[in-house]
Amino acid sequence: MGTVSRAALILACLALASAASEGAFKASDQREMTPERLFQHLHEVGYAAPPSPPQTRRLRVDHSVTSLHDPPLFEEQREVQPPSSPEDIPVYEEDWPTFLNPNVDKAGPAVPQEAIPLQKEQPPPQVHIEQKEIDPPAQPQEEIVQKEVKPHTLAGQLPPEPRTWNPARHCQQGRRGVWGHRLDGFPPGRPSPDNLKQICLPERQHVIYGPWNLPQTGYSHLSRQGETLNVLETGYSRCCRCRSDTNRLDCLKLVWEDAMTQFCEAEFSVKTRPHLCCRLRGEERFSCFQKEAPRPDYLLRPCPVHQNGMSSGPQLPFPPGLPTPDNVKNICLLRRFRAVPRNLPATDAIQRQLQALTRLETEFQRCCRQGHNHTCTWKAWEGTLDGYCERELAIKTHPHSCCHYPPSPARDECFAHLAPYPNYDRDILTLDLSRVTPNLMGQLCGSGRVLSKHKQIPGLIQNMTIRCCELPYPEQACCGEEEKLAFIENLCGPRRNSWKDPALCCDLSPEDKQINCFNTNYLRNVALVAGDTGNATGLGEQGPTRGTDANPAPGSKEE
């Protein structure tokens, strides 16, 4: 009995223990299904329970794994705390486990209202920061685009022309582009008492037309107009020498009428439509030309000529220009005319520049003996300036700005950019002898040397300077024009066989046409070497103001 009763008691205890165990598991499952019991369970695990179960650690540490194993848990969280906006959904899903545990620890099992402020406080700054990071770059970008577009628009617009008269606005010389039916200034204005002084104004210059500034195909009417203007200006120069205004005006009118008549004859000699005024006759023709004249006051100026003026004052041509295939001829052919200015300030910097120029000219002389060797001149230029920079840097003063560069193409480019005379033409002045003016005589009466492939040109200039430079300034131009005409008459008369006439000017009839041919082909561009040429006089040549007879020697032929 005792044994049986003990066995029954043990079985009863086991049954009770089994029943209690099943009830505990069911209660545990029910507690996990409710959010209130969930928070309480987490609270108990955090403070009173032994080491938390693996499932609870995964919730605290790895919420992504928990979301896979417990989908109802996150669904329940969304029901309790819905997101304020669709943009906040990823923020709440990421940060929910992080803010969940501290709130539960501090406030107890069910405190969703206290968790809401924390959730609302943290995400908005994060979203606001993202907006600040994205928006500011967009605004400067718009500003940059506006700044870049506006200058481009302004650069594309032509600036307003100045109100002052521009001599190059109506310039025909060297013109490029579309040509019209007439040259600028054609037909010329008819001489009258109103424009008499302007026509004979010594400072008034005119454009000489020829193949260099007129199209050679398809515009023969422009060539006829240019020839008429050339002949007209030649006649004007002759008439303006008359001392009486009455005789001068009568001469100008006859020259103008004769030029217009010859123009119409040339118009009818070709099978093209003639000028509309040429269809008339007599006074009606002249009145038509007078009415069609674009500038009856003769205020048109010629194209601005970019000339290198004579050296004024002691100026040192430093740094020298970079030798190139284009200027190597000037380097060699004009070397004997390049004189170093005198009376320079005795400063160390200028003396070092002068020493460099003197050394460079010596090297140029060696290179020119090799047949205008461009490579030799370039190496001499580079070596001379490198040596100059070595001396500059050896002194504790401010060296030349280009010497701050090391020996490199950058230094060479710096010196070449600062060269005042890159073509080595400092003392070369291009003169136009087609119209003798007081300014022209002022340039010819100075010390200089003429460079021309035509040997008769230096003789002409010497006759003009010897006989006219001693006269009063107002009379020099008239004297020079008379000497020019006399010299042309002499060349086409007794000395006709002493020189070659490539343009066949002497075959034309004397007076205006012949003189115009000389002006166009021989006297338009004459190079004059200005300054002191004393060092070059011992080479078998004399300057225009030194010597007594510069006429071409009989029998001397020149190309």
Curated annotation (Swiss-Prot):
Glycans are attached at residues 373, 463, 535. GO terms for biological process: angiogenesis; biomineral tissue development; chondrocyte development; endochondral bone growth; inflammatory response; negative regulation of bone mineralization; negative regulation of cytokine-mediated signaling pathway; negative regulation of peptidase activity. The modification Phosphoserine is found at residue 556. Residues 1-19 form the signal peptide. Expressed in the surrounding connective tissues of developing long bones, but not in the cartilage. The long isoform is expressed in a number of tissues including liver, heart and lungs. The short isoform is expressed in skin and cartilage-containing tissues such as tail and front paw. No expression is found in brain. One of its GO terms (cellular component) is collagen-containing extracellular matrix. Residues 170-424 are annotated as: 2 X approximate repeats. InterPro entries: ECM1 (IPR008605), Serum_albumin-like (IPR020858). Keywords: Angiogenesis, Biomineralization, Extracellular matrix, Glycoprotein, Mineral balance, Osteogenesis, Phosphoprotein, Repeat, Secreted, Signal. Sequence repeats lie at residues 170-298, 302-424. The keyword Nucleotide-binding does not apply. Residues 535-559 are annotated as: Disordered. It is found in: Secreted, Extracellular space, Extracellular matrix. It comes from the Eukaryota. GO terms for molecular function: interleukin-2 receptor binding; protease binding. Transmembrane segments: none annotated. Involved in endochondral bone formation as negative regulator of bone mineralization. Stimulates the proliferation of endothelial cells and promotes angiogenesis. Inhibits MMP9 proteolytic activity. Interacts (via C-terminus) with HSPG2 (via C-terminus). Interacts with EFEMP1/FBLN3 and LAMB3. Interacts with MMP9. This is Extracellular matrix protein 1. It comes from Mus musculus (Mouse). The lineage of its organism: Eukaryota, Metazoa, Chordata, Craniata, Vertebrata.
